[in-house]
Swiss-Prot record:
InterPro entries: Acyl_CoA_acyltransferase, YlbP
Alphabetic keyword roster: Acyltransferase, Transferase
Protein name from the UniProt record: Uncharacterized N-acetyltransferase SH1739
Species for this entry: Staphylococcus haemolyticus (strain JCSC1435)
Top-level class of the enzyme under EC nomenclature: transferase
Chain ranges of the N-acetyltransferase domain: 7-147
Keyword Acyltransferase: yes
Signal sequence region: none
Source domain of life: Bacteria
GO molecular function: acyltransferase activity, transferring groups other than amino-acyl groups
Its EC number(s): 2.3.1.-
Length: 147
């Protein structure tokens, strides 16, 4: 498994995200999320990533209940939201996405994920279940619960 690192909220992380803005998918940029976190310097960073050498090649935001509005997860008192997981194209199919998911699961808390950019099949292969609901942007909502 690749090492997942906690990314701090600072301009260095903004620079690391640059490759994702250049080569990644617009729906997954996380520009607003990072800028919002930089404004609120007291908040803990929700960003995690995997490096290949000096380059950030995979990333995700992992939010806690209360960080975002919640309507799809009423049966759980506490949970995480897996937000905008992305692996750069040249690094896909090398286990980086799996490593990020495994890291999120290591908290042993239920996880809600929004299936963006054809990620539904990937998430279902990671034991997430389709709750047959869509978020306001029309993306499928999936959940994972520890056994």
């Amino acid at each position: 498994m690749s090492e997942v690192k906690h990314l701090e909220i600072n301009y260095k992380t903004d620079e690391l995200f640059e490759a994702f803005r250049e080569f990644g998918n617009k729906d997954l940029y996380m520009v607003e999320e990072l800028q919002g976190q930089m404004i609120d310097a007291s908040s803990e960073s929700p960003f995690y990533g995997i490096f290949h050498g000096e380059n950030l090649v995979a990333r995700m935001a992992l939010l806690k209940k209360g960080d975002v509005e919640e309507i799809y997860f009423p049966e759980f008192d506490d949970y995480l939201l897996l937000w905008k997981l992305e692996v750069l194209d040249n690094y896909k199919n090398k286990g980086y996405g799996q490593s990020l998911i495994d890291y999120a699961k290591s908290y042993n808390m239920p996880i809600k994920a929004i299936a963006r950019q054809n990620s539904k099949e990937f998430l279902m292969n990671q034991d997430f279940e389709d709750v047959h609901a869509k978020n306001p942007e029309g993306h499928d909502v999936l959940v994972w619960a520890p056994k």
